[in-house]
């Protein structure tokens, strides 16, 4: 399987909009969010913004809390799904950050390791992002995952970008603004600036 796994330094950082932009840049890809918690439907939003193929098979939990707790409240236990073997290209979006618990013994990075896709990290541009981003990159590399790059989301901050690239030895592949309004057209224009070689 080929593609990218989109994770973030925390929840609400902008993974879904970034995933939609990657779908626009790689129109052959299929979007999949294996685990979704809370009332927001990220899959629908990616479909609206990208017009691309969105897979709806996944675990959907109603409570807007960490996946392990949402599953417990729903009376179930999350089991990590198997990776696709069909040779298609996927943009896979995680829930929360890399160490968010899924069950009593596994976190999101265990799911990511099973899929084995290169990872794009969505990170804020604001104060605190250096530490959060470097910690995320460190965890990913400790599990043998390749970090394809970091996408910084928000008002540009050259100092934070330079620090992340220097101390993390990682490329910041994109700087994405907060879109107001967020329309498919505006996102498409920005998506055209993304690197075209992230998926080998």
Language-model regions, residue ranges each:
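C-terminal lobe/tail of nucleotide-utilizing enzymes
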Residues: 137-200
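Inter-motif core of Ras-like GTPase G domains
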Residues: 103-126
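Hydrophobic anchor at the beta1->P-loop junction of P-loop NTPases
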Residues: 6-7
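Switch II (G3) loop of P-loop NTPases
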Residues: 83-103
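N-terminal phosphate/diphosphate-binding loop that engages ATP/GTP or pyrophosphate donors
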Residues: 3, 12, 17-82, 86-88
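Short internal beta-strands
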Residues: 31-35, 120-123, 148-154
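Short, structured coil segments at secondary-structure junctions
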Residues: 50, 115, 167-170
């Amino acid at each position: 399987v080929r593609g990218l796994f989109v994770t973030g330094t925390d929840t609400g950082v902008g993974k879904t909009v970034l995933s939609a932009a990657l779908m626009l840049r790689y129109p052959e890809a299929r979007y999949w969010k294996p685990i979704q918690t809370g009332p927001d439907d990220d899959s629908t939003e990616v479909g609206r913004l990208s017009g691309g193929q969105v897979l709806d098979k996944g675990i959907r939990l109603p409570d807007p809390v960490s996946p392990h707790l949402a599953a417990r409240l729903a009376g179930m236990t999350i089991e990590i799904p198997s990776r696709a073997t069909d040779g298609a290209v996927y943009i896979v979006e995680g829930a929360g950050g890399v160490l968010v618990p899924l069950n009593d013994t596994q976190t999101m990075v265990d799911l990511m390791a099973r899929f084995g896709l290169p990872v794009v990290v969505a990170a804020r541009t604001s104060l605190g992002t250096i530490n959060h981003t470097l910690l995320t990159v460190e965890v990913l590399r400790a599990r043998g995952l390749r970090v394809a790059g970091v996408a910084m989301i928000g008002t540009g901050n050259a100092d934070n970008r330079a620090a992340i690239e220097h101390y993390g030895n990682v490329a910041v592949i994109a700087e994405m603004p907060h879109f107001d309004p967020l329309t498919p057209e505006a996102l498409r224009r920005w998506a055209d600036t993304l690197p075209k070689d992230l998926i080998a």
